[in-house]
Amino acid sequence: MRALLSTIGSRGDVQPLVALGEQLQALGLEVRLCVPPDFREWIEGLGMAVVPIGPEVRSTGKVDPLATLTPQQQRQMMEGTVASQFETIGAAARGCDIIVGATALQLAAPSVAQHLGIPYVFVAYCPIVLPSRHHAPPVLTWRGDAPPPAMADYRALWAKDAQDWNAMWGSIIDAHRAALGLAPVGDVRSYVLTNQPWLAADPTLGPWPEPDDAATSPTVTQT
């Protein structure tokens, strides 16, 4: 059995997937990782195959690249990011039996898994990534977000967050899905996070606040 583990981020995003990969290897699985090129030499030294994706994170860690761009340049970068993901993850996933994606920039992996007819699992490292009436969505300053008041209506904020996901990524993702013969995505955030994500966080330090409103929250498995 072969598993593809994919993330786009810095060391804190990559290392948990590497730990998962080592455990899967110990169980006899073949593991392949899609990660930024910075980590290739280290991970290959652990006996796992690496397919580089995205830019080196060292070059983007000091300044948020989107914060310094015009809206048109932001759109071009977003389109390029999605196109690169569909190409890279699409090639890396060939011959794999499952895709595990971590961090919310997994914009192509769910479509690639659907196209190949294999399972896809999204993993969050912190409860705040996942919709819940008990906390606010992540604050993205480059998008113009500001921290909400302590007693804000979190459900309304999550509803707006879903609208923002659709506005930012919907048409870009749907264009690539159409090329694969897949239907458009109605809810981009749910498409990325899935309805049954894993929460890889210590249940004491980062517990999932159950019970919750099933109409607005996914069914979370805390690992």
Language-model-derived ranges and their functions:
Residues M1-A49:
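N-terminal subdomain of nucleotide-sugar transferases
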Residues R2, D97-I98, Q196:
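Structural motif
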Residues C34, K160-T223:
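A nucleotide-sugar donor-handling region in carbohydrate enzymes
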Residues A49-I98, P147-A156, I173:
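Phosphate/nucleotide-donor binding subsite
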Residues L46-G47, L116-I118, L193, T216-P218:
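Short, structured coil segments at secondary-structure junctions
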Residues V82-M151, T204-G206:
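Conserved nucleotide-sugar donor-interacting segment of glycosyltransferase catalytic cores
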